[in-house]
Amino acid sequence: MGNTCVGPSSAADRHGFFHSVSLAVLWRPGGRAEPSQPPGYPPRESSHSSVTSSTAPERVTIADSDLSSSTPNKGGNKPKVRRVQSAGLLADSVLKRDSERLKDLYTLGKKLGQGQFGTTYQCVEKATGKVLACKSIAKRKLVSEEDVEDVRREIQIMHHLAGHPSVVSIVGAYEDAVAVHLVMELCAGGELFDRIVQRGHYSEKAAAQLARVIIGVVEACHSLGVMHRDLKPENFLFVNHKEDSPLKTIDFGLSIFFKPGENYSDVVGSPYYVAPEVLMKHYGREVDVWSAGVIIYILLSGVPPFWDESEQGIFEKVLKGDLDFSSDPWPAISDSAKDLVRKMLNRDPRKRLTAHEALCHPWVCVDGVAPDKPLDSAVLTRLKQFSAMNKLKKMALRVIAENLSEDEIAGLREMFKMLDTDNSGQITLEELKTGLRRVGANLKDSEITTLMEAADIDNSGSIDYGEFIAATMHLNKVEREDNLFAAFSYFDKDSSGYITQDELQKACEEFGIGDAHLEDIIKDIDQDNDGRIDYNEFVTMMQKGNNPLGKKGQGQLSFGLREALKLG
């Protein structure tokens, strides 16, 4: 193989078009995820759609109440973190060192994105005028010692991997009274699947170039003792919009340092990309190769290898589902590509390719055997649909919640007041944890965080009254005809009997939702292909996948806020 099986360099990656694809997560009562059927794809047992944004979406933590620490046999006590209860801030330093003031060195600009723990801004270095990104993590949201350790570890890992051409460069970490600020390289070039779709042509050779970047990052992490644990397309961004823009990995929030031979049990990651041994709570670094294999499968076909209409269904497919190499476009894809994917998605981690072996595979290596002929145009269509989330259902649930009578929601209103201990009109993560414990819910912090993320429609970091009602109202209210019609009428501004793209755009603006790829939302729901959503199509969308999963138990890993609060 000579010198062909080496990690990707900026020169080798010039024609890769990396961007991030958002995991398809549809809002459902109780915070469960529901993918929808991608049009134009042969019928399967399940379906999928997703959200695309200018920033990487929140990662999903697949929680389990019986999990042990992510690092086994840690030994010793964690440092005590003193809290100022009145202010909700960490009194001790997160960084454990004196820090220069961020505002003395940088000027903060526009907000680029917001997640559960932090907000990312564009910032400018005063001394040089260089444009960078600043991720500000609110210290009031670091409510446990584990949260603080996670932030410290993320910073350590980013410094540890510094210098790799496909890892975002960290410039510095700063701390003040209210937040920890991570200043890093700005990746403004957009997301993987969007870039592919924009170009309008796509070949196996191009997919192999992208695969080389992904696998190269995995190899670099493993060689430096880092397990990523959350590899997915949305964790890769282009630096700029140029044709030869480098592709960078941007998120190490779930990454850990590992020791060869040790096994880990925290069930973390994102449903479509999680390895089977993670679900079995006994795994090592091989999980990253599995996740990379899933991404490559999607790059070649436009759909994930394992999907279903519920997270539980996805997990069952991951554990025992068959790989589909018979449906289009797989018959036209080279045997070498299928060989790589099959070996990366071997359920036995001992037989799975290592990252280095995958990087040396003939289909991946520089000047390898990947053909340059275009892939089926349907792949581009599916990639586009895979990267657009149906946010309409989330908004519709909120509309229904806000139109319920006082009698219907009286009990939920009192529950909201009970949780909102400071009467701010917002339930914070800490308030949710306290409230759930008061009602006897035996949930781990990671599980409660998952509930929070699902209920927080606008990603503000807290749950307002409308979001709370939407997350906890009973399913029979969602499916009641008068409520469905009222919700439809809210979007149908001109009472034409149809929801148009312009009307959907206005609704997104009212809800504070950014670019939602409206054409793809409509296409996903529009069964008669007239470019509009009629009432029957709207009702079908609202009723699809509403079978409750129930609280997590022996065979279930998903649960909803309604169940957690014991509301039946």
UniProtKB/Swiss-Prot annotation:
Q: In which tissues is it expressed?
A: Expressed in roots, leaf blades and developing seeds.
Protein kinase domain location:
106-364
User: Which residues does Ca(2+) 2 bind?
Assistant: 456, 458, 460, 462, 467
Binding of Ca(2+) 4 occurs at 526, 528, 530, 532, 537
What is the protein's major site of localization?
membrane
Residues binding Ca(2+) 3: 492, 494, 496, 498, 503
Residues that hold ATP according to the record: 112-120, 135
Q: Which Gene3D superfamilies match?
A: EF-hand (1.10.238.10), Phosphorylase Kinase, domain 1 (3.30.200.20), Transferase(Phosphotransferase) domain 1 (1.10.510.10)
Q: Where is the active site?
A: 230
Q: Where is the lipid attached (N-myristoyl glycine)?
A: 2
Name the protein family: Belongs to the protein kinase superfamily. Ser/Thr protein kinase family. CDPK subfamily.
Summary of the function given for this chain in its UniProt record = May play a role in signal transduction pathways that involve calcium as a second messenger.
Protein's name in the database:
Calcium-dependent protein kinase 17
Source organism per UniProt? Oryza sativa subsp. japonica (Rice)
Taxonomic classification: Eukaryota, Viridiplantae, Streptophyta, Embryophyta, Tracheophyta
